[in-house]
Regions:
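Acidic/histidine-rich catalytic cores and adjacent linkers
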Residues: 1-181
Length: 181
């Protein structure tokens, strides 16, 4: 019975690992699909984590709950990026999908054959506009911070101050608000 339980745990751990890899690569990657697709993938991953959580696995349950509660905040960057890509498409008078394809090219490693094959395809499709669009998309990616990293950075810096508030009172909170503004 212990071997069966161990085998079940190994399968569950492998499944959760795969789901988290999908989450990182397909949902949270800056150069990725449109917001609607990311939301659909996000919901699928949450659903799959829910099936694997159970009462015996509080770590998976906590992870699923945290991800479920933070969906809109974690994906906020994708909406910003979508708008930037739409602006680039309008500026260069191209279909949005062509600009999205260049965005997805940024996911590939520049020394890989797949990168250069796709680069050549896109270059031949867009010809004179390719380099301008490539540069604009690169800038859009650089200037689109993922909300989660900003929130985590801010939380880590402010967490200690908010715990101090419990012992120091509301006057300390007023001082902290003044300092942060």
């Amino acid at each position: 019975q212990a071997k069966r339980r161990e085998a079940g745990l190994v399968v569950r751990a492998r499944d959760v690992k795969i789901l988290l890899q999908w989450f990182e690569h397909d949902v949270m990657s800056l150069a990725g699909p449109a917001l609607a697709v990311r939301q659909e993938l996000y919901d699928f991953i949450i659903s799959e984590l829910k099936q694997r959580a159970g009462k015996s696995y509080p770590g998976v349950r906590k992870l699923r709950t945290a991800l479920h509660n933070q969906r809109n905040q974690l994906l906020a960057f994708a909406g910003v990026l979508d708008q930037k890509l739409a602006d680039i498409a309008q500026h260069f008078q191209l279909p949005l999908q062509a600009v999205r394809d260049i965005c997805l090219l940024h996911r590939k490693h520049p020394t890989s054959n797949a990168y250069w094959e796709r680069w050549n395809q896109l270059h031949s499709q867009l010809f004179g506009k390719f380099h301008g669009v490539m540069e604009a998309v690169g800038e859009a990616l650089k200037k689109t911070p993922r909300a989660s990293s900003l929130v985590e950075n801010l939380n880590s810096r402010l967490r200690n101050y908010f715990f101090l508030r419990r012992s120091l009172g509301d006057s300390y909170l007023s001082l902290l608000q003044f300092f942060c503004n």
